[in-house]
Amino acid sequence: MFHQQKYCSNCGNEVTLKFTEGRDRIVCEQCTIIHYTNPKIVTGALCVWENKVLLCRRAIEPRKGFWNLPAGYLEDFEKAEDGAIRETWEEAGTHIEIEKVFTVYNLPQANQVYIHFLAKLKDGIVRNGEESIESALFTEEEIPWKELAFTSSAFALRTFFEDRKTGIYNTHLGTFPEK
């Protein structure tokens, strides 16, 4: 387990890594507080306009120049769906209407959980946001599969196109690496 915390936020004493509650945890032995560390939540949207989906080409690392669904870290005190709306605006300059939670995708090795919402674009206008080199709408046949930035986007897109065949959009759970 990797941790950067050096001092207790409760009493200011140094913390140690200690096996407790069945796993290594950051503990202050002075005041006995356990400092729980939790995965980062990444929220985003699979945005649909007519028969196309929105992808953004990343202008920042990691995976600069690769395509991705608009997504990013959830801010403190922000609702997941509001984060997806914000990220879509920041990356593609477009407004969306959230329909439902579509995929929950676990990346345990990166200590991240992705939540992608299924959303409709309010209009078909997309722009380049501050974190995108390019934003565009793609049909299924046009998706640049080998140029996708992250497995979470590939999972959401594959699942969307499978569900579209039946017209029933379920909520899906995925993990990388797949087990």
Residue ranges and their predicted role:
Residues M1-P62, Y73-E90, T94-I125, D163-K179:
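N-terminal leader/linker segments that precede catalytic domains of diphosphate-processing enzymes
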Residues R63-F66, T139:
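Short, basic/glycine-rich phosphate-binding loops at helix/coil junctions
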